[in-house]
From Swiss-Prot:
Family: Belongs to the HMBS family.
Pathway annotation: Porphyrin-containing compound metabolism; protoporphyrin-IX biosynthesis; coproporphyrinogen-III from 5-aminolevulinate: step 2/4
Function: Tetrapolymerization of the monopyrrole PBG into the hydroxymethylbilane pre-uroporphyrinogen in several discrete steps.
Modified residues (S-(dipyrrolylmethanemethyl)cysteine): 234
Enzyme Commission code(s) on record: 2.5.1.61
Gene Ontology terms describing biological process: heme biosynthetic process; protoporphyrinogen IX biosynthetic process
The name this protein goes by in its record: Porphobilinogen deaminase
Gene: hemC
Cross-referenced PANTHER family: PORPHOBILINOGEN DEAMINASE
Keywords: Porphyrin biosynthesis, Transferase
Top-rank EC class of the record's enzyme: transferase
């Protein structure tokens, strides 16, 4: 029996259940084990709780032998590698884009100046301000139902959340606008899951690897390399999205490449630095580092310094 650790929220258990069900479909026995994390217990802003707020307890449970594997929202994992563990599988990614849920079916551009928009993410807040729509950004915590209720109750005019979370909970009907990357770059690894286990458990690593999706792994590897090189945690105002795209060589043959777009935003929305690049899927990390280097050249370090101080 493979014991899969998960946070206790409905979204987390729903995500972990997709991994459990895929393992069972592959002929393996698997069950979910709920682990409480600091991020679930505290209502303080995520950025104030530090790195690994949703993942440390799950890793401790693996280390203690309480669970064999853990399912994380990949964007919550610290960028610094922990040699005790390995991400054995990255299943096919859900839609990485952000989504708006607004009153009266409105889009961001239709909301009146001064409308209250809730988000838990400095990245979203910075990019929302950069759109110059005159919206008032408000902090937002709690599970997805709690966040959605802020709109239906009239406390907020709109919220911006990950579309993937709404999809996994069957709440896409609530979406009034899906934000394209040109409007708002998502968080690195948004919409992707990381299935982690102890690095020394080679038998389990091999079993979990059956769930791995090569395109998703390449995209997430590039996005996370960019994030790590910027020395930015999961709550920093950094956006990135990579996609496997088809290109044509000089002989007319179709081949696949990896396209990466990244940005760093000032928290007040006064500046957004953007860069992009393209490379081979097998050199995803190098692509991430290359785009990060371009962001640095364009002034990302100074923008990040302003964020940190």
């Amino acid at each position: 029996m493979i014991r899969i650790g998960t946070r206790g929220s409905l979204l987390a258990t729903t995500q972990a259940a997709t991994v459990r069900d895929a393992l069972i479909a592959g002929g393996h026995s698997a069950e979910l084990v709920t682990i409480s994390t600091e991020g679930d217990r505290s209502m303080a802003p995520i950025a104030s709780l530090g790195v690994g707020v949703f993942t440390t307890a799950l890793r401790e449970a693996m280390e203690a032998g309480l669970v064999d594997a853990a399912v994380h929202s990949y964007k919550d994992l610290p960028t610094a590698a922990d040699p005790r563990f390995t991400v054995a599988a990255i299943p096919p990614r859900n839609d990485p884009r952000d989504a708006v849920v607004a009153r009266d079916g409105l889009t961001l551009g239709e909301l009146p100046v001064g409308s209250l928009v809730g988000t838990s993410s400095p990245r979203r807040a910075a990019q929302l301000r950069a759109l110059g729509l005159g919206l008032e950004i408000r902090p937002l915590r709690g599970n997805l139902d709690t966040r959605l209720n802020k709109v239906s109750s009239g406390d907020l005019d709109a919220i911006v959340v990950a579309r993937a979370g709404l999809a996994r909970l069957g709440r896409l009907d609530d979406v009034t606008e899906t934000l394209e990357p040109v409007q708002m770059l998502p968080a690195p690894a948004q919409g992707a899951l990381a299935v982690e286990c102890r690095a020394g458990d080679s038998r389990l690593v091999a079993v979990l690897a059956e769930l791995d999706d090569a395109d998703t792994r390449a995209a997430v590897t590039a996005e996370r390399a960019l994030l790590a090189d910027l020395e930015a945690g999961c709550s920093a105002p950094v956006g990135a999205i990579a996609e496997v795209v088809e290109s044509i060589d000089e002989d007319g043959r179709v081949f696949e490449e990896l396209s990466l777009r990244g940005c760093v935003a000032a928290l007040d929305g006064s500046d957004v630095i953007r860069a992009s690049g393209i490379g081979s899927c097998g050199r995803a990390r190098e692509l991430g580092l290359s785009v990060a280097a371009e962001l640095f050249e364009l002034g990302a370090r100074e923008l990040m310094w302003g964020v940190r101080h």
